[in-house]
Amino acid sequence: YLFDCGAGITRNMVRANVSPGDVTAVFLTHLHHDHICDFPLFVITGWMWDREDSPVVIGPRGTAHFCRNLFEGGAFKADFEARAHYPRRQQNLAAVRPKVLECEPGLAYQDEHVTIRCDWVEHIPRQISECFGIRFEAEGKSVAFSGDTAPCDAMVRLAQDADLLIHECTFPESFIRHRAKTGVGIYSHTSPRQLGEVAVRANV
């Protein structure tokens, strides 16, 4: 299971001796470039490494459009056609045909191993770009993952009593104030102090 697919994810997985083809599902918290830019490499590498099934991709509204315009007939059309020329790659085309689940707050994904719930967080106004935080539960343990967000009640709920909270902490408060004054990132991100307050409220 993979949460977001930013720069270097695929390379780091390979370095850790984890095959991208072994990842059951990918959850994209939102569709900003720094959270999805490695996704094409992740999918194509899985294809090249003989993945047989379609990767499950869970994300906000727009995820299906994003995936549909990447490979066959999309931005990576030339790459796809070159690799698909080989008979072996013709046999596992499912690997570059993701199964997309666009989620709403609540239960986003469940299989025999994991349960993933999500809720909207406060990064960008929702009518522009949906952004999700998630709670991942497996083997009696829970992990909360914020994606990008300002402090918000939804993330506190997702993180409540979790075994691990992975929360963004991008800028100090002085820079968050500066961004607000310049009209950039009025909602956006969480400072170190604010993250401490979220953790206390969530009892993690």
Predicted feature locations:
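Binuclear metal-dependent hydrolase catalytic cores
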Residues: 1-143
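Cap/insert and terminal regions of metallo-dependent hydrolase folds
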Residues: 133, 142-144, 150-204
